[in-house]
Amino acid sequence: GIGIVLDGVFSHTGSDSRYFNREGRYGEGGAYRDANSPYRGWYDFDPKYKGGYRSWWGFETLPEVEEEDPSYGNFVCGKGGVIDTWLGLGASGFRLDVADELPDDFIEKIRAAVKAHGEDKLLIGEVWEDATTKEAFDHRRTYLRGHGLDATMNYPFRNAAVAFARGEDASAVGEQIMSICENYPKPALDCAMNFLSTHDTERGITAIAGEPANGRDRYWQSKRMIPGDRIDDALRRVLLAYAMLYTLPGVPCVYYGDEIGMQGYRDPFNRAYFDWNSTERRLRVPLSNLARLRRSCDAFDGGSMELVEASADVLHYRRVGKEQSAEIILNNGPHLIVRTAFGKQTEVNPGGFTILVEDNQPQHVGYFKYY
């Protein structure tokens, strides 16, 4: 089936919302226009701020809210509130925007409201770093201690996959991967959101094979595309990165358009409309195959993670489940390599990967090769 996880933006509202109403779209009500508005306590009005109120990173169109205001807390977390309403209508969970800017106790209230609809309802947070060592507001955050987020967006894995696919040394990539695997509680690791692109990053193919923007202006970014004679190599590198994200711990996610090789630097170029006229299809079948493999092999469903080799051009790791084990060998170099997996010599093509799966039961010894 399909589950819908909503994006919950609870650290700020729009200035043009009925709650703030700076532009007067909703009459004379709203916190900005009416000092007696029921929403007035949601915001911090003070002449010291630009525009006379505290706003998200100084953007006056995004006034910040006071999450600890009782009225606001009830609006989001109370009976008939935002979370209760949407989960009651069938949503499967929430992704919290800028989770590191939400107080821990507010996240705990959100969790309680989410889990009131069932323990299977998901609460995932936007955290760009290792969520177990993240510090914000002068203290160590407690996201993954069992009373906050179920999991976070896995930017560390994304950064590792991009680096490896670009051809960077595998040793640092292996260290980054294992740091997350060792630091995260297993339930949080198993449902971490693995991705190559988001609405806040360059698209994966651009990050991997495009010319770095290096602060260049939007006009330059709007015109810059990967040359046609490099597209084949770019798509191959993107598939290498996705092979990592589909076989590492966590849940792989494909940002719309990645499956047809859509390019784009950061906002707004990474948020372009889906290109319905695209004839690019070379990633669709391999990505579908990776998805089928992941569903068919229990090693990828909560199996243990062991790094076998991370050196120069080679990243080799093993996943072990109850019924099956898998060995994944990735090669970001220009030469064919040979490695041992399940006791057998295995070739991996330049810029390619090989996934071997073996049944753990003695009576079913054998393996099949994916790539």
Model feature map: region roles:
Residues 4-6, 94, 123-125, 194, ...:
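Hydrophobic faces of well-ordered beta-strands that scaffold small-molecule active sites
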Residues 331-371:
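C-terminal beta-sandwich/jelly-roll accessory domains of carbohydrate-active enzymes
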Residues 53-69, 88-91, 204-207, 214-229, ...:
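Short glycine/proline-rich turn/loop motifs
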Residues 308-341:
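Carbohydrate-binding surface patches
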Residues 1-89, 110-116:
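Substrate-binding/active-site clefts of carbohydrate-active enzymes
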Residues 11-12, 17, 21, 27, ...:
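Active-site-proximal helices and loops of the catalytic beta/alpha 8
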Residues 287-297, 301:
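Amphipathic alpha-helical
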Residues 137-138, 190-226, 242-280:
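Aromatic/acidic polysaccharide-binding cleft in carbohydrate-active enzymes
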